Amino acid sequence: MRQFDISRRLAYYGFMELQVELLKLIQQIRFPLLDVLFQAITITAEELFFIVLAAWFLWCGNKQLGYRVGFAFLVSTVVNPMLKNSFRLERPIGIEGIEAQRLHTAEGFAFPSGHTQGAAAFWTGLMSFVRRPWMYRLGVSMIALVALSRMYLGVHWPVDVLGGAAAGIVTVLLMNKLFDLASRRKNKFLLLWAVLPLAVGLFLVEDKNYVQPFGALLGFWLGYLLEDRYLKVEVAAVWWRQGLKMAVGLLGLIGIRVGLKLLLGTVFPSDFMISNLIRYFFIGLWLTVGAPYVFRNCNIQYKKNE
């Protein structure tokens, strides 16, 4: 893959020194309570948080919202490591005067920030669907807070979070256009235009952070087609059925995530890309069609007489 040395360009124009000083300024306000707060904020832009919210939308809340936000978020998550491996900007970790926290979330290169890009894709997707003032305020606030948290924790440059926010927003705008086109033409196969081009990256980006979300995206798309063709489940239900669906669905999700990792680990090395692709493919499939199929056939789905 062609690489663009952004760090040299930024240094040439004097931006790196400016960014170092800005990070030091942000970290001057540090104290233990803020450490906890910003670590909690950054968790809202991580895999577990988004999976649980996607599950709720798809199983209990609003399927169409879940599909739109899910597709945009996954496409954005796939694009992020491709951009990182193209620009190859190093993180501020190790810079004198900057203290880094939560280092296990700071894998790979810096630009653009994956947490900020994910938050921007998720919340922009919600804002484009739920067009209410309170949602705009919440969405913009969450994107800004996640961006600030990554700088406060010392794992990203300001340019990283700005680039991440821009990439996430642009992805949502493009995916909304594609979704609208697929709806007008009543042809859900048009969504393949968002999936197939990204398959090329499997041969260019040797990064599990690319393979995993691509597997989930592929499973999500196939499950979307199968659910619409064969199930068409209603997500509305009384509160206890909603709780039961979430419990059963999330347990199934954990089983797939952990069970397949153990099973595939007996066949492939733990870091083998194909095993990650397969595992996340079934996670995407479970979210969209697997869990709804179980809900319907185990009589925990919506009942008309309730």
Stretch-by-stretch model annotation:
Residues 53-55, 67, 77, 93-261:
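Membrane-embedded catalytic cores of phosphoryl/pyrophosphoryl-handling enzymes
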Residues 63-90:
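Membrane helical hairpin/interfacial module
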